[in-house]
Regions:
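N-terminal mitochondrial targeting presequence
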Residues: 1-41
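Hydrophobic/aromatic beta-strand patches that form the interior of the parallel beta-sheet core
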Residues: 70, 109, 165, 231-233, ...
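Serine-dependent carboxylesterase/thioesterase catalytic core
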Residues: 73, 124-222, 260
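Active-site catalytic motif of lipid deacylating hydrolases and related acyltransferases
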Residues: 64-139
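Glycine-rich, phosphate-binding/catalytic loops in enzymes
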Residues: 86-89, 151-156, 180-184, 249, ...
């Protein structure tokens, strides 16, 4: 006699089916997995500038902003990760980016916040780190939601924030977070949170990444400040069959449209029409912090397929943009 095996919800196939048609911005486009998709550009252009290969090569000259640049990691980020204590070099979150900025005379402050703490707790730590590093100077920040909260609600008194540049930040939440919570189920969530807390993993940030929380709670209570300049970038790519983002990309694409595997372009946009600097094409969420670029550039050299995105060139160009804005 055969016994039925109950499959936990978290292991089931996604409830969001991969539809051959995806709707966004009042347009339909065909997305059959059996044939190449038409260009995504018509949809992306509705959001603003589409960036293809402007950051494939590091230029000889970049202007340096007048004031220090703060780099602060996002969810599950870190300053330096050490797998073997002092015996092996640590893995840096901003690998190569900080060094490239510093080499061109740009003062860089690296801020470290709790990897998965609540936005409020991370913002408090961010303010303390910047205060120590800035020593009273005005700063330009490249970060995300924590910085928005810090600027709007904490209002630091010992330093002034001139600008905030966000890169693929989920300003309107992420349907990936919605999907994960839906799969876990409300009845099992306390058990998972308890287990994570036992491992000293803070859980405050997870529920704050849902679309409902961001649009109904966070954004209405965290308004932009008039004397701060807000800039933003989004990213979009089509994952390969081997990509770790294949499932999350599918969920996002079916609900929000073009995305980088974790955050959609529509959720990334912030700062109004003039503040949104463009959508990086063919770039995943990990590409944005230079984690995957080294392997991809090496593979490109071997196969002859030239990479179109270099994270270091991108961050240098952000610094150049800040300089041209008088910051």
């Amino acid at each position: 006699m055969r016994h039925a095996v109950r499959i936990p919800n978290a292991l089931r196939r996604p409830s969001v089916a991969y539809s051959p048609y995806v709707y966004s911005n009042n347009r339909w486009y065909h997305a059959s997995p059996y044939r190449s998709r038409p260009s995504l550009e018509p949809r992306l252009e509705d959001h603003g500038r589409v960036i293809h290969d402007e950051y494939s090569v590091i230029r000889d000259k970049y202007a340096a902003p007048k004031y220090p640049v703060v780099l602060a990691h996002g969810l599950l980020g870190f300053d330096e990760l050490r797998f073997a204590g002092r015996y092996l070099p640590g893995v840096q979150y901003w690998r190569g980016i900080k060094e490239a900025l510093t080499a061109r005379g740009i003062e860089v402050i690296i801020a470290t916040v709790p990897p998965s703490g609540s936005i409020e707790a991370r913002a408090e730590e961010l303010a303390r780190d910047i205060e120590l590093g800035a020593r009273g100077k005005d700063v330009n920040i490249i970060a995300g939601l924590d910085s928005r909260y810090m600027i709007s609600r904490i209002r630091p008194e010992k330093f002034k924030v001139l600008s905030l540049t966000t890169i693929a930040s989920p300003h309107r939440g992420s349907s990936v977070a919605d999907y994960v919570f839906d799969q876990i189920g409300a009845e099992r969530l306390p058990q998972i949170y308890y287990a994570l807390n036992r491992l000293n993993v803070e859980t405050g940030a997870f529920g704050q990444l849902t679309r409902k929380y961001m649009t109904e709670t966070f954004n209405p209570n965290v308004p932009d400040i008039e004397d701060v300049r807000y800039f933003s970038y989004g990213a979009a790519f089509e994952p390969s069959i081997w990509s770790a983002f294949r499932m999350s990309h599918r969920v996002l694409a079916s609900i929000e449209g073009p995305n980088d595997g974790l955050v959609s372009v529509s959720s990334s946009r912030w700062g109004g029409e003039s503040g949104y600097k463009g959508t990086l094409m063919g770039v995943s969420h990990l590409d944005l912090i230079n984690w995957t670029n080294r392997l991809k550039w090496l593979a490109g050299e071997v196969t002859g397929n030239r990479r179109k995105f270099n994270a270091i060139a991108f961050y240098l160009d952000i610094a150049d943009m800040l300089s041209k804005e008088g910051l």
